Amino acid sequence: MAFSFIAEQLAQRKQQHLHRASVAITGKQARYIEVNGKHYLNFSSNDYLGLASDPLLVNAWKKGADLFGIGSGGSYLVTGYNKVHHDVTQQLQEWLGLEAVVLFSSGYSANQALIKLLLSKDDLLVQDKINHASLIEAGAISAAKMQRFKHNDMQHLGSILNSQQHTENKLVISEGVFSMDGDSAPINALKQQCTEHKAWLMIDDAHGLGVLGKEGKGTVVDQQLNNSDVNIYMATFGKALGVGGAFVSGSSQLIDYINNFSKPYIYTTGLPPAMVYCIGQAAHLAQTQQWRRDQLDELIRYFKHLSAHYEIPLMPSNTAIQPVLIGASDAALAVSQYLKDKGFWTTAIRPPTVANGSARLRITLTSQHLKQDIEILVKQIKQAIDANNF
């Protein structure tokens, strides 16, 4: 039978406790969410600064629609590039210290577009082993040779680059904050390796922008560098900024090259101008409202302190992403379901998103949480682990 693999692979996923399905959330993204008529404390959202449903942004989207309409009407090189797109790219350049910026519909499409555009069969792509799926998949289907270095292992990275000295075009990619582990890349060491071996460095800062660094400028700035010190800096607007879409930055020449040669950019309808106006307002709030980061940092420290007290097996992270390592996929599902029954929305992350044997609860904190939320959550996690003998 044609395409029989579809049913076979779905059955296999279910047997391995790896099957997934979307769950519809009623209402707004917030501290509490509603699913099937029941309310849950939400510890699975990437809305780190609590902006996704902020009234200021809701009104900004409405105002953007009044000013610019809803749809962009075309691709960026035809009629889809509104003045608001231009203004927001300028705003991002000034806020983040970037030379040039181009907008994309999503971080996934931005990463896929860049790797496809820049690398050919004679080139080398080197990635951190646990980079985001958008980066790994793009590398796998690229004509370039791809090698992956052990997570944050600069010695391994150096040995790979040293073995490829005669390759002219070398691109090293790392996430700034790793989406499933929550730890950060050693940006200075990465830059040093790339400089020494004449390679370009790209940082995907989807989970660092808005949260880390002075004025929320991200992971690179948090580590005492400038965003312009890396060859390519990209990030998204759908995490800390609470909206959606993404951007890529680099030299003016690189952005000009994307404008002229990147098919995913050229042949995609531009981001809705009302949405882009809202992104601009979100960027302003992320830059200026330091209290959101201060509150989030305090909650992160509190969660880590309580988890240590209750001997909960956290992975090493100082960011809003706090993974609780469980191990087996069925065990992670059991703990997640236990917490849902107690009124906490937590997500079990399983292979192939993470390595076999490293299934986990991906706890994410936001500035909207209260200390008492965390106190109850940590106690329930402890009870869930004890009840299931993990």
List each model region and its residues.
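N-terminal glycine-rich, Lys/His-bearing helix-loop that initiates the first secondary-structure elements
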Residues: M1-E94, Q192-K198, S329, A359, ...
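PLP-dependent enzyme catalytic core of the Aspartate aminotransferase-like
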Residues: P55, N59-K63, L67, Q90, ...
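Short loop-beta-helix segment that forms the pyridoxal 5′-phosphate
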Residues: S75-T79, Q90-A113
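Conserved PLP-anchoring active-site segment centered on the Schiff-base-forming lysine
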Residues: L114-A133, M154
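Active-site phosphate-binding strand-loop segment of PLP-dependent enzymes
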Residues: Q147, H151-I203
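Active-site PLP attachment segment
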Residues: E215, V221-Y257
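Structural motif of enzymes handling amino- and sulfur-group chemistry
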Residues: G270-Q289, A308-H309
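Conserved PLP-binding catalytic core of the aspartate aminotransferase-like
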Residues: Q295-R301, Y310-K342, T353, S358, ...
